[in-house]
Amino acid sequence: ATAGKVIKCKAAVCWGPKQPLSIEEIEVAPPKRHEVRVKIVATGICRSDDHVISGALSDMKFPVILGHEAAGVVESVGEGVTKFKPGDKVIPLFVPQCGECRCCKNPESNLCYKNDIGKYDGVLLDKTSRFTCKGKSIHNFISTSTFTEYTVLDEIAVAKIHEDAPLEKVCLIGCGFSTGYGSAVNTGKVKPGSTCAVFGLGGVGLSVIIGCKVAGASRIIGVDLNSDKFTTAKECGATECINPKDYNIPIHEVLAKMTDDGVDYAFEVIGNTTVMTSALSSSHFGCGKTVIVGLAPSSAVMSFDPLLILTGRILTGAVFGGWKSKDDVPKLVRDYLNKKFDFDPLITHYMPFEKINEGFELLRNGKSIRTILTF
């Protein structure tokens, strides 16, 4: 009944940095050619959304509807769309997969050229947005915008998933879980019997731990300044956890003593350039690999002694855990349904959508891992 019509619905609009999100009635235009309109059922609160609210990502265009980790149901499709129909369960993809660009054609890469990460144009592929509020056009956020009851997505930025998938759980596959898990199994390529250190034990860091465990690592050391996070980290597979505040020597020296000169794999899951250098320094000089997972503020610069690399360390990273989004998201959902991993330790809070600002406060105060908002 709503197909082809403008839908009025609730959304959380970010009118500018350093202010709470505002619940507004917005208009969502119908999907154009090769677009899909989706009713969002569940959406997670991710640290990257908060980087926009705090002003850390300075290139962002306002006003904007944030949110990029979600699951929902197709409401209607635009002209030329053949792979989706109303009622399909889907996950929006902040890294699209066009299938035609250099990255999509390269099996080693997943960062489709049609993404909006770092550019932050805040529009769909046709250079316009489908959102309006109080007569103003509202920007999109990295191809997704999920803090709204309805969103419009380019069809290259949607994955159809199994009809049995519980949307309030698998929404994590839209960002946090896949980013962390893939950083271990794809980007790091963690080997059985190896030693890993994970810096930052939020939702993504815990997902790195799950990935290290699935990959067969024998030691997984969690590192965080908040010792309250250690219980959940161990539940996810960490074999031990350390707090840098408990030592009067640099953390890479602590790890060197624990691991016969350094870990095989180090993961930075905070987005802090000082910690990135610590992670690199904590990896073994001749054969250690460091994976950057965290998103640093716009102007941040990482500095380190090139000798760290010259001796044989590898420094790498990936967006969205290296997954080719359209291909791999449905497989990850099937793996979840087949109980290859469990999301329950990652989800600490469920909240109604209207309480979105409270959800962000929990994240900022270190009181939550993942908060899932439901409509």
Curated annotation (Swiss-Prot):
GO terms for cellular component: cytosol. CDD domains: alcohol_DH_class_I_II_IV (cd08299). SMART domains: PKS_ER. Its main location: cytoplasm. The modification N-acetylalanine is found at A1. PROSITE patterns: ADH_ZINC. GO terms for molecular function: all-trans-retinol dehydrogenase (NAD+) activity; zinc ion binding. Zn(2+) 2 binds at C98, C101, C104, C112. It comes from the Eukaryota. It catalyses: a primary alcohol + NAD(+) = an aldehyde + NADH + H(+); a secondary alcohol + NAD(+) = a ketone + NADH + H(+). The keyword Flavoprotein does not apply. Coiled coil: none annotated. Binds 2 Zn(2+) ions per subunit. GO terms for biological process: retinoic acid metabolic process; retinol metabolic process. It is found in: Cytoplasm. It holds the Pfam family ADH_zinc_N. Its EC number is 1.1.1.1. NAD(+) binds at G200, L201, G202, G203, V204, G205, D224, K229, V293, G294, L295, R370. Its cofactor is Zn(2+). Signal peptide: none annotated. Zn(2+) 1 binds at C46, H68, C175. Keywords: Acetylation, Cytoplasm, Metal-binding, NAD, Oxidoreductase, Zinc. Belongs to the zinc-containing alcohol dehydrogenase family. Class-I subfamily. This is Alcohol dehydrogenase 1. The lineage of its organism: Eukaryota, Metazoa, Chordata, Craniata, Vertebrata.
